[in-house]
Amino acid sequence: MSKSEQLFEKAQKVIPGGVNSPVRAFKGVGGTPVFIQKAEGAYITDSDGKKYIDYVGSWGPMVLGHNHPAIIDAVLKAVPNGLSFGAPTESEITLAELVTKLVPSIELVRMVSSGTEATMSAIRLARGYTGRDKIIKFEGCYHGHSDSLLVKAGSGALTLGQPSGPGVPADFAKHTLTCTYNDLDSVKTAFEQYPNEIACLIVEPVAGNMNCIPPKNDFLKGLRALCDQYGAVFIIDEVMTGFRVALGGAQAYYDVKPDLTTLGKIIGGGMPVGAFGGKKEIMEYIAPTGPVYQAGTLSGNPIAMAAGLACLTELSKAGNEEKLAAQTKTLAEGFKALADKHNVLFTAQYVGGMFGLFFTEQAEITNFQEVMKCDAAKFNRFFHLMLEQGVYLAPSAFEAGFMSLAHSDEDIQATLAAADKAFAQL
């Protein structure tokens, strides 16, 4: 029995399912989850001492690679001054200034401790600002685990929200309208049906929780226009895409300006940080300047602020944005070429520093329904064939993969060599 198997057996006795976030349990791909002992650069090492080229990157934050010296140095310098104060610090101002510089649509920003907290707070703010209750989200998009966002679509392109599982009251979920990603007509229908009731629309600009699905050319700008037409707050959820699709986020890449933006992952440099920000007139509706309440004991934590500032400062250096995108392109297109070589039905999609692998005959995947038609069983086999060769992909057919600046040309070529062998066995 491996050390990971022993640890998983032990963990299940004291932690629900043996993990602290469901996808880590490997239920989507089968087998025993890999327990990690340490990480460095593009590599993680498991409890048995086996090294893997890592394309999960802690689910996105590790854009510089693991254990980056600039971040470690910043954290070690901050720690002796105290771990938490519950009071304002200069470091939270400095990070906020950098965020507003990198993402011009953000005029004011509030720090929180997670992406879920950011999206939950942004939606509460939008409801308070507009005096409306209903919200629009998209089937297959994930915005954290708050009640109003754990809602699935019923039959048809548009439905009154239905809870995605136990614990979410139907009376609460009914305020969430679910539309089809990349389908403006479904959004128009929602607004036409409830023209004066929709507080906000929230969207992943690149859907990264049904693998990796970029928006169609007119989709995001069409959403912007509909929100303007009906007086709804337009929220772009950049928890995953922020600073990764482009330095200014997916909103910069696709040239669209939201009213509010949510951030997470990279903004903390590996520490637990989230943020939401946007137009001054909306953000001033949040306490203490406005009536919408939001608070957090560890919001603006000084250690997390130091890590986030170091990460964004390093990432902002000339050439890094282009390098990240180029490395991702090389990897994704390499996967596709190898699949073609072995006559495996396969499509790779990528934007900036994120990518998705789809086992399908379709040339392009554009929404949740198309994702569900992909061959998840074949992905699971591919995942384990890669894992055996020391390549750690996301353990789910429905999660995006992440490149880092630490991945070298040699790492990518080693990954593709492993993929060549894996595709040959499918």
Curated annotation (Swiss-Prot):
Pathway: Porphyrin-containing compound metabolism; protoporphyrin-IX biosynthesis; 5-aminolevulinate from L-glutamyl-tRNA(Glu): step 2/2. Its cofactor is pyridoxal 5'-phosphate. It catalyses: (S)-4-amino-5-oxopentanoate = 5-aminolevulinate. Its main location: cytoplasm. Keywords: Cytoplasm, Isomerase, Porphyrin biosynthesis, Pyridoxal phosphate. SUPFAM superfamilies: PLP-dependent transferases. It holds the Pfam family Aminotran_3. InterPro entries: 4pyrrol_synth_GluAld_NH2Trfase, Aminotrans_3, Aminotrans_3_PPA_site, PyrdxlP-dep_Trfase, PyrdxlP-dep_Trfase_major, PyrdxlP-dep_Trfase_small. It is found in: Cytoplasm. GO terms for molecular function: glutamate-1-semialdehyde 2,1-aminomutase activity; pyridoxal phosphate binding; transaminase activity. It comes from the Bacteria. The modification N6-(pyridoxal phosphate)lysine is found at K265. One of its GO terms (cellular component) is cytoplasm. Its EC number is 5.4.3.8. One of its GO terms (biological process) is protoporphyrinogen IX biosynthetic process. PANTHER family: GLUTAMATE-1-SEMIALDEHYDE 2,1-AMINOMUTASE, GLUTAMATE-1-SEMIALDEHYDE 2,1-AMINOMUTASE 1, CHLOROPLASTIC-RELATED. Belongs to the class-III pyridoxal-phosphate-dependent aminotransferase family. HemL subfamily. Homodimer. This is Glutamate-1-semialdehyde 2,1-aminomutase. It comes from Actinobacillus pleuropneumoniae serotype 5b (strain L20). The lineage of its organism: Bacteria, Pseudomonadati, Pseudomonadota, Gammaproteobacteria, Pasteurellales.
